């Protein structure tokens, strides 16, 4: 009885692991690029995200540190 339970648990975990690795492969890569439409200091990530989506057709955007301050970066599906 205990060995059948162990076998069933092993099979369920194996199927779960195979399914989760397949899902990751579907997501694809995301490419990062500095915004071409944002100018100046980026202190508002929500504004950067909105501008990247509307003006540059990106998936999303965010402010990140870049010497000497912060810049808006847009993220696209590669």
Curated annotation (Swiss-Prot):
Signal peptide: 1-20
GO terms for biological process, alphabetical: defense response; defense response to fungus; killing of cells of another organism
Cellular-component GO terms for this entry: extracellular region
Subcellular compartments: Secreted
Pfam families recorded: Gamma-thionin (PF00304)
Function according to Swiss-Prot or TrEMBL: Confers broad-spectrum resistance to pathogens.
Superkingdom, natural source: Eukaryota
Alphabetized InterPro entries for the sequence: Defensin_plant, Scorpion_toxin-like, Scorpion_toxin-like_sf
Name of this protein: Defensin-like protein 19
Family label: Belongs to the DEFL family.
Keyword Transport set for record: no
Cystine pairs: 31-78, 42-63, 48-72, 52-74
Keywords per UniProt: Antimicrobial, Disulfide bond, Fungicide, Plant defense, Secreted, Signal
Keyword Disulfide bond set for record: yes
């Amino acid at each position: 009885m205990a060995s059948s339970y162990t076998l069933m648990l092993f099979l369920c975990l194996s199927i779960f692991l195979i399914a989760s690795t397949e899902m990751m492969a579907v997501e694809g890569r995301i490419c990062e690029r500095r915004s071409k439409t944002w100018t100046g200091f980026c202190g508002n990530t929500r504004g950067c995200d909105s501008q990247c989506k509307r003006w540059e057709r990106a998936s999303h955007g965010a402010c990140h540190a870049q010497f000497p301050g912060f810049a808006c970066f847009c993220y696209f599906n590669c």
